[in-house]
Amino acid sequence: MLKRQVTNVNFSGAGQGAGAGASEAHSSVSPSPTGAPVAGDKIDPSALPPLAATSPDTDDNSGEDSGLVGSGAGVPLPSGLTFRFMGHEGRTLTPAADELLASLAARNVHDVVVSAPPLKLEPRYRRVFTPDAVAFVASMCRTFDGQISEMLRCREEKDAQLAGNMLPGFLPHTTHIKRGSWKISPLPARLMDRRVDIGDVATHDARALLAALNSGAQGVQADFDDGHCPTWERTILGLDNVIQACLGKLTYTDQETGEVVSMKRDSDSAVMMSRPRAWNMRERHMMVAGREVLGAMVDFALIMFHAGQSMHTRGVGPFFYLSKVETHQEARLWNDIFTWTEQRLELPRGCIKGCVLIENVLASFEAEEILYELRTHSAGLNCGMWDYAASFIAKFRHRPEFVLPDRSVYVNMDAHFMRAYRDNVIRICHRRGAPATGGMSPVARPGSDLRFPNLPITRRDIDM
């Protein structure tokens, strides 16, 4: 049996899921004393050693034995091993997972495994992880595997250069982009008014998500990144809630009063802008060809497969926030994924829009190139103050001249280095016809429901 240990993942709750500067969550795999099967072995599932039972309350991402037998990150799945990818309770597959994998096998898809859901979430699991949807995710992963691997390699290389005291700078070979007269494609009507978004809304909480959508704000950021604690249970709940919201069908039943709360009609509801997980986060409950799928691919692909056509037809999307982007090559990757998705789902080119969060010091030097790469799919750029400041710690932590003072007193938009960053983003966006939006303010609108004291309001003026 193979034992997996996952490190560098934050489990402290909403708002702490994948903070700025988080390094990639690597998986280290080592054979257990019982002896691990090797790639290519024909395995009789009944002969495999029993899995140790764990408490249903155990954190999915705690790093304990996940119940995955015979494969690890980067290790090809044995040809006879298809139905042994267990849920976090260490039991045999649930009927929902069994049906899913059998359906995939009937489609001649043998290299995809998805963890079983908690029993109480089987209906939602069936609704989100349909065979066609999972096959779509897998196809996306295979298509972009090479580009993603190269992107992650370039990140490691850049970090090594920074550790060697290299400093970032503006790119000399992209002068033609910076001197060109291009602009982004016109924005859809629903993105023309960007005064207020409610940000970092935890997706697993249907009541809070509905409160945000019905609040009267212009937009809602449904957050699978910083506002998401990526346990398997919360991920299933979050994906189902967001997909239903994107379809305009999300409801919540108050357990005390029995009242059923529904979304307002599209014209009165806030526009949904989902934020997939950042590139450094992996979804350890789904594997394609023996490799853990990136969380960003799972979030984006499932939302688009189930709700992309509906959002486009109704004029309410599909719109996304793209977080933790560091270079224009990463923006190009997102643009390629958008274009591929539009082709596969028979959507008009450019209908998917993405707002890139410039929340990393490296990205601030390539903001114009990032906007250029996404110009057909751009919904503008966003300034994330706290993540941007944190990126100085992540990238220059070994250099004493970059030590920051007390952030509660001195690190704000009045600081010179923060003003320079903000003004650069505004200048670029205004020149290129793109919205430049601001960061989050922890305030509640007057008369807001006090049952949601942690529901933040984000002010995002086009002119900041």
What are the residue ranges of the model-derived segments?
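Conserved small/polar residues in nucleotide/adenosyl-binding loops
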Residues: 1-2
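Serine/threonine-rich intrinsically disordered cytosolic regulatory regions enriched
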Residues: 6-10, 36, 42-45, 56, ...
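Intrinsically disordered, low-structural-confidence terminal and linker regions
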Residues: 6-9, 80-114
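Intrinsically disordered, low-complexity regions enriched in glycine and serine
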Residues: 14-22, 61-64, 68-73
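Conserved alpha/beta-domain cores
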Residues: 100-143, 166-183, 188-192, 198-204, ...
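Short linear, low-complexity motifs centered on an aromatic residue
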Residues: 153-170
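Active-site-surrounding "flap" and adjacent substrate/cofactor-binding loops of secreted or lumenal enzymes
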Residues: 232, 236-249
